[in-house]
């Protein structure tokens, strides 16, 4: 669960990534609360555990020019699990890293910065390369358009319907609670 959450954090951070012709978004467009509402992966852990997963909440804050902090709240069998992770920019445009447990890179496939973002993450750990796609939303209820974009991009990356999970909303924990 921790590695999944850390990968989610890195993906959120890379919402700063833009296409070459696009303008870098204002920090206020990236900062704030996000909900991880859908996932796609072919990893054994995901395929085994996806039915138990619920929506994760995250809050992005800027610590400086090159650092972001992400606070998380995720329901677990032992209650609400909360943690924070700090990410640093690399020399590559639009790339951020967190390397405590594994090498992680992310790519923003599609976003409007206002309501949704589709992220593709790659993680290398113990010589294995793992991939996961995520749909982030500013609200618990993702728009049908954003969900359609996510599903289309998942198919393009060869994820089957069995490899996609729309995460149920949860009220157990929030990044807003102390």
Curated annotation (Swiss-Prot):
Native species: Gallus gallus
Subunit record text: Monomer.
Identification of the protein by name: Extracellular fatty acid-binding protein
PANTHER family assigned to the protein according to its UniProt record, in alphabetical order: LIPOCALIN, LIPOCALIN-LIKE 1 PROTEIN
Sequence similarity: Belongs to the calycin superfamily. Lipocalin family.
Tissue specificity of this protein: Expressed in egg white (at protein level). Expressed in the magnum of the oviduct (at protein level). Preferentially synthesized in nonproliferating cells.
One GO term (biological process): chondrocyte differentiation
Induction / repression: Down-regulated by dietary stress. Significantly decreased expression between days 0 to 5 in egg whites of eggs laid by corticosterone-fed hens (at protein level). Decreased expression at day 14 in the magnum of the oviduct in the corticosterone-fed laying hens.
Name of the gene encoding the protein in the UniProt record: EXFABP
Pfam families given in the database record: Lipocalin (PF00061)
UniProt GO MF annotations: arachidonate binding; fatty acid binding; linoleic acid binding; oleic acid binding; stearic acid binding
Signal peptide bounds: 1-20
Matching CDD domains: lipocalin_Ex-FABP-like
């Amino acid at each position: 669960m921790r590695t999944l959450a850390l990968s989610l954090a890195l993906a959120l951070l890379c919402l700063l990534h833009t296409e070459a012709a696009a303008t870098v978004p204002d920090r206020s467009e990236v900062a704030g609360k996000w909900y991880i509402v859908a996932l796609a992966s072919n990893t054994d852990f995901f395929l085994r555990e996806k039915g138990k997963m619920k929506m994760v909440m995250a809050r992005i804050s800027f610590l400086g020019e090159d650092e972001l902090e992400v606070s998380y709240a995720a329901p677990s069998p032992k209650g609400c699990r909360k943690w924070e992770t700090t990410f640093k920019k690399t020399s590559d445009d639009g790339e951020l890293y967190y390397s405590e447990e594994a090498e992680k890179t992310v790519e923003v496939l599609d976003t409007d910065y206002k309501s949704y973002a589709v992220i593709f993450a790659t993680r290398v750990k113990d010589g294995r390369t793992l991939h996961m796609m995520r749909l982030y939303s500013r609200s618990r209820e993702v728009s049908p358009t954003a969900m359609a974009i996510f599903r289309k991009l998942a198919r393009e990356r060869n994820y089957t319907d069995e490899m996609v999970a729309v995460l149920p909303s949860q009220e157990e924990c929030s990044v807003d609670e102390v």
